[in-house]
Amino acid sequence: MSNLSLLERRIIAAEKLGEHWAELHATWMQLDDAKKNVLAALMNDLDDGEKSEAKLDRLARGSKEYKDYCTNLALAKGAELRAKVKYECARDYFEAGRSAEATARMQMQTLGHIP
């Protein structure tokens, strides 16, 4: 990897961070998509045939299991967002380097150093 240019190393770093972000985003999406299923399963566990749907919903949402699920969902979203910020910073760092190199080439051409 030592033969790679600075820009090549930057894009490789951005790609790795992008992959990590995608993995964390997928994890969060799975948790988020399962939210209604988790709530329904908790309501089914509490259903004795006598409680109303509204009461089952309230009891399920107030349960420790659902609170823990929501906490894990929030933690997954936070991790996903932090990974996204790191990826976007790495991508922008690459773009800044690419722009700087293009500017330097243009300056050399303008000054006549490059045929």
What is each residue range found by the language model?
Residues M1-P115:
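Charge-rich amphipathic alpha-helical interaction elements
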